[in-house]
Protein backbone atom coordinates (compact mmCIF):
# COMPACT_ATOMS: atom_id res chain seq x y z
CA UNK A 1 0.00 0.00 0.00
CA UNK A 2 1.16 3.49 -0.83
CA UNK A 3 2.84 5.37 2.03
CA UNK A 4 0.85 8.53 1.31
CA UNK A 5 -2.46 6.65 1.45
CA UNK A 6 -1.51 5.17 4.83
CA UNK A 7 -0.61 8.66 6.08
CA UNK A 8 -3.93 10.04 4.82
CA UNK A 9 -5.82 7.34 6.72
CA UNK A 10 -3.99 8.22 9.93
CA UNK A 11 -4.90 11.88 9.47
CA UNK A 12 -8.53 11.01 8.77
CA UNK A 13 -8.71 8.76 11.84
CA UNK A 14 -7.80 11.77 13.99
CA UNK A 15 -10.66 13.81 12.53
CA UNK A 16 -13.11 10.95 13.20
CA UNK A 17 -12.28 10.79 16.91
CA UNK A 18 -13.62 13.32 19.39
CA UNK A 19 -11.18 14.68 22.01
CA UNK A 20 -11.20 12.69 25.25
CA UNK A 21 -9.74 13.27 28.69
CA UNK A 22 -7.23 10.46 28.13
CA UNK A 23 -4.63 9.67 25.50
CA UNK A 24 -6.24 7.42 22.91
CA UNK A 25 -4.46 4.48 21.32
CA UNK A 26 -4.24 4.17 17.55
CA UNK A 27 -4.80 0.76 15.96
CA UNK A 28 -4.39 -0.78 12.53
CA UNK A 29 -7.21 -3.13 11.51
CA UNK A 30 -6.61 -5.55 8.62
CA UNK A 31 -9.15 -7.85 6.97
CA UNK A 32 -7.63 -10.74 5.02
CA UNK A 33 -9.12 -12.70 2.12
CA UNK A 34 -8.67 -15.92 0.14
CA UNK A 35 -6.55 -17.67 2.75
CA UNK A 36 -7.18 -21.12 4.18
CA UNK A 37 -6.51 -20.36 7.83
CA UNK A 38 -7.05 -23.98 8.82
CA UNK A 39 -3.53 -24.41 7.41
CA UNK A 40 -0.98 -23.19 10.01
CA UNK A 41 1.38 -21.84 7.33
CA UNK A 42 -1.28 -19.30 6.30
CA UNK A 43 -1.73 -17.87 9.78
CA UNK A 44 0.04 -14.72 10.88
CA UNK A 45 1.98 -15.14 14.10
CA UNK A 46 4.55 -12.37 14.23
CA UNK A 47 6.37 -10.06 16.60
CA UNK A 48 7.05 -6.80 14.78
CA UNK A 49 9.47 -4.09 15.90
CA UNK A 50 7.83 -0.73 15.19
CA UNK A 51 10.22 1.78 13.55
CA UNK A 52 8.69 4.67 15.52
CA UNK A 53 8.36 2.67 18.73
CA UNK A 54 5.18 2.21 20.75
CA UNK A 55 5.14 5.73 22.16
CA UNK A 56 4.65 4.44 25.68
CA UNK A 57 6.12 1.67 27.79
CA UNK A 58 4.61 -1.79 27.79
CA UNK A 59 4.52 -3.80 31.03
CA UNK A 60 6.98 -6.70 31.07
CA UNK A 61 7.09 -9.53 33.60
CA UNK A 62 10.20 -11.61 34.31
CA UNK A 63 9.89 -15.10 35.77
CA UNK A 64 13.23 -15.69 37.42
CA UNK A 65 15.30 -16.34 40.53
CA UNK A 66 18.66 -15.27 41.91
CA UNK A 67 20.72 -12.76 39.93
CA UNK A 68 18.29 -12.56 37.02
CA UNK A 69 15.39 -11.72 39.35
CA UNK A 70 17.53 -9.07 41.05
CA UNK A 71 18.46 -7.54 37.68
CA UNK A 72 14.80 -7.40 36.67
CA UNK A 73 13.87 -5.71 39.94
CA UNK A 74 16.57 -3.07 39.43
CA UNK A 75 15.07 -2.36 35.99
CA UNK A 76 11.63 -1.82 37.52
CA UNK A 77 10.09 -4.88 35.86
CA UNK A 78 7.50 -7.15 37.43
CA UNK A 79 9.28 -10.14 38.95
CA UNK A 80 7.61 -13.51 39.48
CA UNK A 81 9.73 -15.84 41.61
CA UNK A 82 9.39 -19.61 41.83
CA UNK A 83 7.15 -19.66 44.90
CA UNK A 84 4.82 -17.05 43.35
CA UNK A 85 4.76 -19.03 40.12
CA UNK A 86 3.63 -22.14 41.96
CA UNK A 87 0.85 -20.15 43.65
CA UNK A 88 -0.32 -18.74 40.31
CA UNK A 89 -0.73 -22.29 39.07
CA UNK A 90 -3.34 -22.77 41.79
CA UNK A 91 -5.09 -19.42 41.30
CA UNK A 92 -6.31 -19.03 37.72
CA UNK A 93 -8.09 -15.73 38.42
CA UNK A 94 -4.90 -14.02 39.60
CA UNK A 95 -2.92 -15.65 36.78
CA UNK A 96 -5.34 -14.17 34.22
CA UNK A 97 -5.00 -10.70 35.78
CA UNK A 98 -1.21 -10.88 35.49
CA UNK A 99 -1.44 -12.17 31.92
CA UNK A 100 -3.75 -9.34 30.89
CA UNK A 101 -1.69 -6.67 32.66
CA UNK A 102 1.58 -7.48 30.85
CA UNK A 103 2.43 -7.30 27.17
CA UNK A 104 5.44 -9.59 27.28
CA UNK A 105 6.94 -12.25 29.53
CA UNK A 106 10.56 -13.34 29.94
CA UNK A 107 11.48 -16.52 31.81
CA UNK A 108 14.70 -18.01 33.10
CA UNK A 109 15.25 -21.04 30.87
CA UNK A 110 15.51 -23.61 33.66
CA UNK A 111 12.12 -22.45 34.99
CA UNK A 112 10.28 -22.99 31.70
CA UNK A 113 8.91 -26.46 32.61
CA UNK A 114 7.26 -24.95 35.70
CA UNK A 115 6.08 -21.95 33.67
CA UNK A 116 4.41 -24.28 31.18
CA UNK A 117 2.66 -26.16 33.96
CA UNK A 118 1.61 -23.13 36.02
CA UNK A 119 1.00 -20.33 33.50
CA UNK A 120 0.96 -22.11 30.14
CA UNK A 121 -2.84 -22.57 30.08
CA UNK A 122 -3.27 -18.81 30.63
CA UNK A 123 -0.39 -17.37 28.58
CA UNK A 124 -0.58 -19.79 25.63
CA UNK A 125 -4.04 -18.78 24.34
CA UNK A 126 -3.05 -15.10 24.65
CA UNK A 127 0.10 -15.61 22.58
CA UNK A 128 2.23 -14.52 25.53
CA UNK A 129 4.39 -17.55 26.29
CA UNK A 130 7.68 -16.25 27.74
CA UNK A 131 10.91 -15.67 25.90
CA UNK A 132 13.39 -18.05 27.61
CA UNK A 133 16.79 -16.63 28.59
CA UNK A 134 19.75 -18.05 30.52
CA UNK A 135 20.20 -17.13 34.17
CA UNK A 136 23.17 -14.88 33.35
CA UNK A 137 21.42 -12.98 30.53
CA UNK A 138 21.61 -9.22 30.12
CA UNK A 139 17.94 -8.23 30.04
CA UNK A 140 18.45 -4.68 28.76
CA UNK A 141 18.57 -5.39 24.98
CA UNK A 142 15.58 -7.73 25.11
CA UNK A 143 13.53 -5.29 27.18
CA UNK A 144 14.45 -2.44 24.80
CA UNK A 145 13.25 -4.51 21.83
CA UNK A 146 9.99 -5.47 23.54
CA UNK A 147 9.32 -1.79 24.26
CA UNK A 148 9.12 -1.28 20.48
CA UNK A 149 7.34 -4.53 19.62
CA UNK A 150 3.76 -5.54 18.88
CA UNK A 151 2.40 -9.06 18.38
CA UNK A 152 0.00 -10.41 15.77
CA UNK A 153 -1.67 -13.82 16.00
CA UNK A 154 -4.58 -14.39 13.62
CA UNK A 155 -5.14 -18.03 14.56
CA UNK A 156 -8.21 -18.99 12.48
CA UNK A 157 -9.61 -15.47 12.01
CA UNK A 158 -9.16 -13.55 8.76
CA UNK A 159 -8.80 -10.28 10.67
CA UNK A 160 -6.40 -8.70 13.12
CA UNK A 161 -6.30 -5.44 15.07
CA UNK A 162 -2.93 -4.23 16.34
CA UNK A 163 -1.66 -1.21 18.28
CA UNK A 164 0.51 1.19 16.26
CA UNK A 165 0.94 3.99 18.82
CA UNK A 166 -1.09 6.69 20.51
CA UNK A 167 -2.51 10.04 19.51
CA UNK A 168 0.35 12.11 20.92
CA UNK A 169 2.67 10.59 18.30
CA UNK A 170 3.00 12.36 14.96
CA UNK A 171 1.06 11.29 11.87
CA UNK A 172 4.33 10.30 10.18
CA UNK A 173 5.36 8.11 13.12
CA UNK A 174 2.03 6.32 13.20
CA UNK A 175 1.99 5.85 9.43
CA UNK A 176 5.52 4.39 9.50
CA UNK A 177 4.43 1.86 12.12
CA UNK A 178 1.34 0.89 10.11
CA UNK A 179 3.43 0.50 6.96
CA UNK A 180 5.94 -1.74 8.77
CA UNK A 181 3.12 -4.09 9.78
CA UNK A 182 1.63 -4.15 6.28
CA UNK A 183 5.10 -4.93 4.89
CA UNK A 184 5.27 -7.99 7.14
CA UNK A 185 1.90 -9.13 5.77
CA UNK A 186 3.14 -8.54 2.23
CA UNK A 187 6.28 -10.63 2.77
CA UNK A 188 4.34 -13.43 4.44
CA UNK A 189 2.30 -14.39 1.40
CA UNK A 190 3.32 -15.20 -2.16
CA UNK A 191 0.66 -12.82 -3.51
CA UNK A 192 1.55 -10.18 -0.93
CA UNK A 193 -1.04 -7.52 -0.21
CA UNK A 194 -3.49 -9.12 -2.65
CA UNK A 195 -4.65 -11.03 0.43
CA UNK A 196 -5.55 -7.78 2.23
CA UNK A 197 -9.27 -7.26 1.64
CA UNK A 198 -9.30 -3.94 3.51
CA UNK A 199 -7.31 -2.00 6.09
CA UNK A 200 -8.20 0.81 8.47
CA UNK A 201 -6.67 3.04 11.12
CA UNK A 202 -8.68 3.91 14.21
CA UNK A 203 -8.38 5.80 17.49
CA UNK A 204 -9.83 4.17 20.62
CA UNK A 205 -13.07 6.17 20.61
CA UNK A 206 -13.23 7.04 16.93
CA UNK A 207 -14.58 5.55 13.72
CA UNK A 208 -12.31 3.58 11.40
CA UNK A 209 -10.63 5.41 8.52
CA UNK A 210 -10.02 3.21 5.44
CA UNK A 211 -6.62 2.98 3.78
CA UNK A 212 -7.19 3.33 0.04
CA UNK A 213 -5.72 0.50 -2.02
From Swiss-Prot:
Organism: Methanococcus maripaludis (strain C5 / ATCC BAA-1333)
GO biological process, one term: translation
Entry's family note: Belongs to the universal ribosomal protein uL1 family.
Record key words, sorted: Repressor, Ribonucleoprotein, Ribosomal protein, RNA-binding, rRNA-binding, Translation regulation, tRNA-binding
Pfam families named among the record's database cross-references: Ribosomal_L1 (PF00687)
Protein name, as recorded: Large ribosomal subunit protein uL1
Complexes and interactors: Part of the 50S ribosomal subunit.
Gene Ontology MF annotations: rRNA binding; structural constituent of ribosome; tRNA binding
Designated gene of the protein: rpl1
Cystine pairs: none
Gene Ontology cellular component list: large ribosomal subunit
Protein task: Binds directly to 23S rRNA. Probably involved in E site tRNA release.
Amino acid sequence: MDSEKILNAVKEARTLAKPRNFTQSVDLIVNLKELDLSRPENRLKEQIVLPSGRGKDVAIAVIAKGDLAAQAEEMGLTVIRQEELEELGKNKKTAKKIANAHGFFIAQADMMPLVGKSLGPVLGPRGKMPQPVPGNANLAPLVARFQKTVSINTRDKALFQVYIGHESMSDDELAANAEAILNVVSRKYEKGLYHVKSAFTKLTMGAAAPIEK
